[in-house]
Amino acid sequence: MKQWALILGASSGIGAACAKKLAEAGFNIYGIYLRKPQSVIDGLEDYIKSQGVEVQFHKMNAMNEDKRLEAIDNLKKLGIIKCFIHSIAFGTLKPMLSKNDEPVLDSKNIEMTINVMGSSLVYWVQELHKSNLLVKGTQIFSMTSSGGRRQWPSYGAVSMAKAVLESASRQLAIELADGGIAVNAIQAGVTDTPALRKIPGNEEMIQYAIDNNPSGRLTTPEDIASYVALISQSNDSWMTGNVIRIDGGEDITG
């Protein structure tokens, strides 16, 4: 059967880099995206096709249950999932407490952020597993950050979501281990992506990372994609339930 990589958040940043690198490694690509213009998607599709693999990009809300089931039904007709990447970056950036009457997080903000960036991993894996699309050797990756353990201004809801994502990844790793399916969270170093640029104080974060990373630079989406592709080709599930830091040493010095 044909082997596919399913990528949520495939149109930019780490998701797009993973789509390209996995295509280079021979994976067919099924990308889910929400906002990028068609011209960007066309460019990605052209590059992926040039690697001699199949590609489908679908514009949809990954949290919409009907759309998710529609995607699963489509995937069942295509083959099996050997790599699943959860790389959704969409959350509310507000403080928890008000100073000078500034807007603060409310219950809808927190619930939405946790569901989109955290809990949705579980919902997708449940459907993939139920549909027998996950097989021995499948690699599942969730994209976390040091924000799951460290606090930044206005990052509270996203930080909560990352903690949920890591916990869900560990639990899924336990429940899928006997099937030879690995689940790991990837903690990238500070990476200059559209998602990072939305975080208040991002320029200070970038400069701090550059100044303190022993490798002397920021992490790039391609850094992450290279390791994701390498692991995805291994067919080995013994490394599972981890938070894998890919950051040039940033975390141990920061």
Set out the residue ranges of the language-model regions.
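Conserved glycine-rich Rossmann-like NAD(P)H-binding loop of the short-chain dehydrogenase/reductase
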Residues: 26-42
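A glycine/serine/threonine-rich, flexible loop-to-helix segment
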Residues: 42-43, 157, 178, 185, ...
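Rossmann-fold cofactor-recognition segment
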Residues: 48-66
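Catalytic loop of short-chain dehydrogenase/reductase
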Residues: 89-178, 190-191
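Short, small/polar-rich loop/turn modules that mediate ligand/substrate recognition or access, typified
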Residues: 177, 182, 239-241
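A conserved structural motif in NAD(P)-dependent oxidoreductases
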Residues: 213-224
